[in-house]
């Protein structure tokens, strides 16, 4: 059996929830609130009385209509008007009897209906008494059900039913009798007897409790329900007395009666022609009445109706639309977050996360998706992804030069080689300056760019570090150079970094000139160097190859002019040219943060001319050239191709190796830098957030991985990069080293606060902490390590990482004794009289009992005695008494080994 909610039924009936609950209580159905569910049986109980009322109302006019239908319409109309005036004085008792008689007559077959034509007049007269109207409603209804036409006559009877009170109990309602009635409804019997105009004047009279104007019109609606209205002329059937009887005494009762009729009428099944017009007209009148009531009777009921109307509108089913094809294309840059993609597709982020998990990717709403992943996801949901990322490199691509615009430029020479083979000493000798004096430990820590003039021709030199940590810097040096001078010590030969330099140069397609240094030493063997380099593909010209070899001594300044002549000769062969009349373009050789000047970068101009005041972009930073100076700290206003200059005016410290491009205006430079910054952020986010289910499972299986966080500060960007990369290489499966921050400049309070929050160590490379930062570090217990040689930094970090590892336990052998006799001692158990064979027996040490070289027991020594005296240890060659804790099964001939477990620090 289906159940219906109270509020749903109220909406169907067009009444308020409270009114419906009151009606349910009246028929004996108890409900707690508007959300309660009621059965169909209870709904039938509720609808029964409403049906009866309508039948009783229709009953009164059945007879007149029948007369009309039998072509005696005029007579019926003529009889009613004189009878109605008598309705008011008629006594109530007579009304009851006559009503009963009418019911009996109605039970007769339909053909006898014309005989009953006179009775309607009597009924109308008697019903004019409103005093007993309410009590007799039900009884009259029962009688009316029998004839088919009675349902049409309901409106008049309802007027009588409300005054009459007690006759209702006699007849029983017969639903079967009501069925035939609908068949006769469409004959247009009601229209003539239910004139709407007649009710208007009677409106003010019956208003009892509510004298408002809208009430007469309101009562009119139930009467108009029947389809009889259009059938007859309204003039003759306007009985003034009938109208007042129809109006309920109270406004609330009228409302209930009207709505009950509406619901009942909606449920009746009659000919289509009769039902449709009735509903249309009634709906329009209801709207008019509600509008009137909202204006003149504002109150909870009016509000309730308004709410109902709103609910009906809200409940309308919305049409699901599909975006146009052009709207199903989502434009993204390199990456997009899950939340942003879901927002653009108009779906929930959880759906995307679920789809990603099916693909084996653990993701959150802030997870960054690359273009390919986003494309796969969007395709599953019917969308397309379009990559609209600007190709900045294409925008900044340099325009080709015409042969006429090219002029000769100085060669850029990079000096490379193994650590401590004399690269900087050679450059120092060439420049005749003491560059090496300032380098800690004799190791070049950053790239230097220098301009040297020889015989009126300029040569630009780049000095690169030889330490293994500076591989990236050597690779960059090889890319921007024209010629490489490979320095090899004659007394040391080819070393690992020598091979690396050769590989970098070959990869860049740069010609190599080999400078065999330190030939002034007695142990120098230049021929061995040539032989070793030949294995790397560098064959000397003397041996039929193409590689130039020059034996030099930087210390004694031997053959330096010859080396420079070879450089110029190689440059002439290469025919190095560049266009000076265009926007400058170059490479960042080195960058640092100067306390007085801000970010400063060494720029090697490769084409065009850089002038003071030019706007530029380099990596993720932009700026304007405020000032320039050469390697000798002299201010310059412009710099042409192959000229290294220090540029002041950056917004931040660029990375070594970034491309430097001069632009027309600041707006363009700022826009490009912003796009690059956004791209870097998205890439970093994607890098850190990628974690598949398999990787997650592996991490869980491996257990806890210990982290060592570090903050690296250096004097120049190249050194910071080198140190950071060296530290990252120290990570192992057991311990992971994270460089959480790396920048140039002194150690500040911000760095200390970051180290405090992340439990990190601060490494300073050629920098010192500020006074406040030092005090804060001591207060917070932050470890600050300062270095000027990269070897020391790497070694200390290794030690720190080893300290994080769990120490390993190692067994240390102490001594061995042979059991020669056993004794049973109270409170000590069995004591073994033993002879120490080697080592020494130490009290409270760990012991192992061996029998036939098989371990029988392992535990702790209970006591150690010598001649009844407790001793700390017994050396080899002496006798002693030994007891073992919680073990007494000691036999002659057993061997007792003494040992201890010591913790040993784990090495990486």
Swiss-Prot record:
Region span, G1: 417-424
Keyword annotations: Cytoplasm, GTP-binding, Initiation factor, Nucleotide-binding, Protein biosynthesis
Amino acids binding GTP: 417-424, 463-467, 517-520
Residues covered by region (G4): 517-520
Feature: compositional bias, Basic and acidic residues: 167-177, 278-296
Gene3D superfamilies the record matches: 1.10.10.2480, P-loop containing nucleotide triphosphate hydrolases, Translation factors, Translation initiation factor IF- 2, domain 3
Region of interest (G3), residue spans: 463-466
Keyword Protein transport applies: no
Pfam families referenced in this protein's UniProt entry, alphabetically: EF-G_D2 (PF22042), GTP_EFTU (PF00009), GTP_EFTU_D2 (PF03144), IF-2 (PF11987), IF2_N (PF04760)
Stretch list, region Disordered: 145-312
UniProt xrefs under InterPro entries: EF-G-like_DII (IPR053905), EFTu-like_2 (IPR004161), IF2_II (IPR044145), IF2_N (IPR006847), P-loop_NTPase (IPR027417), Small_GTP-bd (IPR005225), T_Tr_GTP-bd_dom (IPR000795), TF_IF2_bacterial-like (IPR000178)
Bias (Low complexity): 194-217, 263-276
GO CC, one annotated term: cytosol
Gene Ontology MF terms: GTP binding; GTPase activity; translation initiation factor activity
Subcellular location: Cytoplasm
Coiled-coil region list: none
Span list, region G5: 553-555
Region span, G2: 442-446
Domain of life of the native organism: Bacteria
Keyword Ribosomal protein: no
Alphabetized SUPFAM superfamilies for the sequence: Initiation factor IF2/eIF5b, domain 3, P-loop containing nucleoside triphosphate hydrolases, Translation proteins
Stretches assigned to the tr-type G domain: 408-577
Function in brief: One of the essential components for the initiation of protein synthesis. Protects formylmethionyl-tRNA from spontaneous hydrolysis and promotes its binding to the 30S ribosomal subunits. Also involved in the hydrolysis of GTP during the formation of the 70S ribosomal complex.
HAMAP family, per database record: IF_2_B (MF_00100_B)
Family from the record: Belongs to the TRAFAC class translation factor GTPase superfamily. Classic translation factor GTPase family. IF-2 subfamily.
Name this polypeptide is given: Translation initiation factor IF-2
Protein source organism: Geotalea daltonii (strain DSM 22248 / JCM 15807 / FRC-32) (Geobacter daltonii)
Lineage: Bacteria, Pseudomonadati, Thermodesulfobacteriota, Desulfuromonadia, Geobacterales
